[in-house]
C-alpha cells in the first residue's frame, strides 16, 4: 500500500517565492555594468520614441533653408576678348560719345535724321549752359599779364571767340518763331543770350570789334521778331507782364544803345495795347490806364465807353 502512494514533490524555489511573497520580485543586484546594447534594444527604443505621444514633446519651428547661391562657372580656358557694347559705352565720356555719334551721322546720313527726331528738344537752360561753357573757355584762353584788349590778346583768343559766336548764331534761330511757338521761351533765351554778348571782350582796334557789333545787330533783330509775334498772341500778355520793358531797357543801356530799335518796337506794341490815350511808353503817372487783362478780370472793361441808345 505504501508503495502505491506517490511521494509528494517539494515545491520549486521560484514558485515558493511567488506564492509566499505578495510583492513583485526585485531586480537582481548583480547586474553587469558594461553589458552591451543589442540592435534589438535600439530598435525597440526607436519604436517607442516614434510611438510616444507628441503632446509633451517640444514644438519644432520650421527653418527656412538658405537660398542657393549662384556662382558663375569659371571659364576653363582664359583668353582675351573685347568688351561688350554696354560696357564699352560706360567707359566713354560725353565728348567721346559726341565724337562717335557725329562721325556715325556723317557716314550715314539716314542715321542723322533719326538722331534729330529722337533727341529731346533743347531747353533754354541747356542751350545757355552750352554758351556759358564756350564763354568760360574764351575767358581761360586770355594770356596771363599784359593788356587784355590788345591785338596780341585778340589773336590768342580768336579761335574760342569764333566758337562762341558760331554757337550763338546756331542756337538763336532755334528759339525764334515760327519754330518756337511760346513767346515766354523765346524771351527767356534772348535775355540770357544778350547777357552773354554783354560779356564779350572789347578791343582797342575797331576792326576787332566788328564781330561783337554784328552779334548785337543779330540779337536786336531777334528781339524785334519775338516782340511782334508776342503782340499778336493773347493780346501781348507776355509783354505786359514780366517786366520785359525794364529788362530790354537795361540791355540797351549795357549795349550802348545798339538795341534801341527793339526798345522802340516794344514801346509801340505796349502803346497800342494801352490804347490811343496813353501818354507814351514808360510813363509812370497816377492816371496810368489799367491793362486790358486787368479790366477783363475785374469786370470793368468797356465801362467808360459811351453806348448809343435808340435806333441805329
From Swiss-Prot:
The organism of origin for this protein: Aspergillus fumigatus (strain ATCC MYA-4609 / CBS 101355 / FGSC A1100 / Af293) (Neosartorya fumigata)
Region listing for Disordered, in residue ranges: 15-83
Gene Ontology MF terms: proteasome binding
Compartmental location: Cytoplasm; Nucleus
Keyword hit for Nucleus: yes
Protein name: Tethering factor for nuclear proteasome sts1
Keyword line: Cytoplasm, Nucleus, Protein transport, Transport
GO-annotated cellular components: cytoplasm; nucleus
Annotated function: Involved in ubiquitin-mediated protein degradation. Regulatory factor in the ubiquitin/proteasome pathway that controls the turnover of proteasome substrates. Targets proteasomes to the nucleus and facilitates the degradation of nuclear proteins.
Entry similarity comment: Belongs to the cut8/STS1 family.
Self-association state and partner proteins as the record states: Binds the proteasome.
Biased composition (Basic and acidic residues): 38-49
Family annotation (InterPro entries): Cut8/Sts1_fam, Cut8/Sts1_sf
GO biological process: nuclear protein quality control by the ubiquitin-proteasome system; proteasome localization; protein transport
Biased composition (Low complexity): 20-32
